[in-house]
Design a protein with these regions (language model features):
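Conserved acid/base catalytic micro-environments in cytosolic active-site loops
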Residues: 2-6, 12-27, 33, 38-39, ...
Length: 359
């Protein structure tokens, strides 16, 4: 049965083009189309849709205001945000993801550009993921905020529950759909004294990862930044891969630095976590702590398998219940690569216990 889609856009031309694209795919059916957030709210209050395609800038009630109203009234909806490719657009998109949107796509400025095959393919594949995802994680997020230990108490926890942490370690995290919100329940809980650098590949297009890293940095005690070419890795710092490039780690005279490559997308994504994991094969870290979080597809599995063949790894996968999309962790688990499977609210603790903190 075709998935029922609600389209919310104030532009009659753009609305028609988006609806035509959706209806061209037998997996979907445009059930309703409206011009602003208020009309959408009225429909969502009484109808169920498999996904909502939501514009940002609209009269009467814009996209963010609709998400706020849905959250306030505890109305669940699986929202795909149509964003603009600007610095301000990136900020608004991150706000939307915090408010419960599951994913976003850059909407071209003109309706003509929307008809290009590359956009249509990307839009329909993203819509399929959203339509088959769980609704926004309001309850999970609130539970994490209420029950999570602070970064300071995490240090005490690690010291009171020491594991045999020896040698140098590095943490490498992969996440996709649902990741931006889930990562806000993980990274801010890691202590600044974490005794390892952290690499992070979140599937995002160019122009969004810088704002995403800044937002995580504002919430965290340890430093979070978009990784720059040639930058040397430091313990207690999270390096977020740039969008649209593959992040690798190079060993130069005993120093580990960030290196980007512009190879084609792999697993349908760019950046791809497989490149990150495989770049650590020839490193001298005594152990690589691999963390695979919510997301569609199998990114991370091949890279971790290749890494495990050459190095000691410890693989942590997010559990099914707390994932928005149980794809990437499921593939790692089914491949027999996972050492621990834990819910979202235990990931930070598991990472900290695995690598330790500086004395």
């Amino acid at each position: 049965m075709a998935k029922k889609i609600l389209v919310v856009d104030d532009s009659a031309l753009m609305r028609r083009v988006i609806c035509d694209i959706i209806d061209s795919d037998e997996r979907f059916q445009v059930a309703d189309r409206v011009t602003n957030g208020l009309e959408a709210f009225e429909l969502l209050s009484k109808n169920q849709y498999d996904a909502v395609v939501l514009d940002v800038n609209m009269p009467i009630m814009n996209g963010l205001q609709l998400l706020e109203e849905l959250r306030k009234n505890k109305i669940t909806a699986k929202v795909l945000m149509a964003s603009t490719d600007t610095k301000e657009g990136a900020k608004i998109t991150l706000d939307a993801l915090e408010l419960g949107a599951l994913d976003f796509i850059h909407k071209p400025d003109s309706a003509m550009d929307c008809r290009v095959d590359s956009f249509k393919e990307r839009f329909l594949s993203t819509l399929y993921v959203v339509a088959n995802s769980k609704p926004a994680m309001f309850s999970i997020a609130s539970r994490v905020q209420e029950n999570s230990r602070t970064a300071e108490s995490m240090v005490d926890l690690v010291k009171k529950n020491p594991r045999k942490v020896t040698g140098s370690k590095i943490v490498a995290i992969a996440s996709s759909t649902g990741g931006p919100k889930a990562l806000q329940a993980v990274i801010p809980r890691l202590p600044a004294s974490l005794d390892a650098p952290v690499l992070l590949v979140q599937h995002m297009p160019p122009g969004f990862t810088s704002s995403f890293a800044e937002r995580l940095n504002d919430l965290s005690q340890l430093k979070v930044k978009e990784a720059r070419e040639g930058e040397e890795l430091q313990n207690g710092t999270v390096y977020v891969s740039m969008g649209g490039m593959h992040m690798n780690v190079k060993n130069t005279a005993g120093k580990y630095t960030i290196h980007y490559s512009d190879e084609p997308a792999r697993e349908g994504v760019k950046p791809c976590a497989n490149y990150m994991y495989e770049s650590l094969i020839d490193s001298h870290f005594d152990e690589v702590v691999c963390v695979v979080m919510t997301g569609m597809g199998a990114d991370g599995t091949a890279g971790i398998r290749n890494l495990e063949a050459r190095k000691k790894v410890y693989v942590i996968a997010q559990d099914q219940e707390s994932c928005v999309v149980y794809g990437m962790p499921k593939n790692v688990i089914n491949a027999g690569l996972s050492d621990r499977v834990v819910p979202l609210d235990q990931l930070a603790q598991e990472i900290a216990l695995s690598v330790g903190v500086k004395a």
